[in-house]
Regions:
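Residue-level detector of anion-binding/catalytic polar loops
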Residues: 79-80, 142
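FAD-binding subdomain of flavoenzyme oxidoreductases
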Residues: 110-193
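N-terminal flexible segment immediately upstream of the FAD-binding catalytic core
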Residues: 1-72, 89-119, 134, 148, ...
Length: 193
């Protein structure tokens, strides 16, 4: 098996953990910042469980403004950030790093709008893939990119990984089924594409 080459650990970040956690706790509610070993344990891996590492901290923001402020702070302090949807990916996209913040997007779990006339849904990144299908199936619709993890995987993770499933042969993968995204860049800038 090939070893995953990981970035070199920045010891200066590890030495500043308490200062970083304190600042992050000012950017979101304190209960949304996890930093104790027992709190971090569930985040030591994604579905690629052959690799485990405890993140510096986990931050669970509740809105775009908080994400923007967290990323702006981390960018200004050269703190790595690993975004995480539901952690169901097998490609290593959400692997935690010892000197990085894991930015969990699970609290962004609302469907904001369903527009049947234009065949589109506006959703936050933490909504599950299957959650979208359940929301529209009573009108005869479903969300076609359906990975085997559709019960638990998040739309944000689907976008990040360009997920697909058995229906992708006919309807394409995630990029073929989205009209746009709002995302926060690493410097905290909010962009729409």
């Amino acid at each position: 098996m090939t070893e995953i080459a990981l970035p070199k650990i920045d010891i200066s970040i590890l030495n500043r953990k308490s200062e970083i956690v304190k600042k992050l706790s000012k950017l979101t509610d304190r209960e949304n910042v996890l930093s104790e070993s027992d709190e971090l344990r569930p985040y030591e891996t994604d579905a690629l469980s052959v690799y485990t590492q405890t993140p510096l901290a986990v931050v669970l923001p509740e809105n775009t403004k908080e994400v923007s402020e967290i990323l702006k702070y981390c960018h200004s302090q050269n703190i790595k950030v690993v975004p995480r949807g539901a952690g169901t990916g097998l490609s290593g996209g959400a692997l935690p790093l010892q000197d990085a913040i894991l930015l969990g997007l699970g609290k962004f779990n609302k469907i904001l709008e369903i527009d049947y006339k234009n065949n589109c849904v506006v959703t936050q990144p933490g909504v599950t893939n299957l959650g979208i299908t359940h929301a529209v199936e009573h009108k005869g619709f479903y969300y076609a990119p359906d990975p085997s993890s559709q019960l638990a995987c998040s739309i944000g993770g689907n976008v990040a990984e360009n997920s697909g499933g058995v229906h992708s042969l006919k309807y394409g993968t995630t990029t073929n089924n989205i009209l746009g995204v709002e995302m926060v860049m690493m410097d905290g800038t909010v962009c729409r594409f």
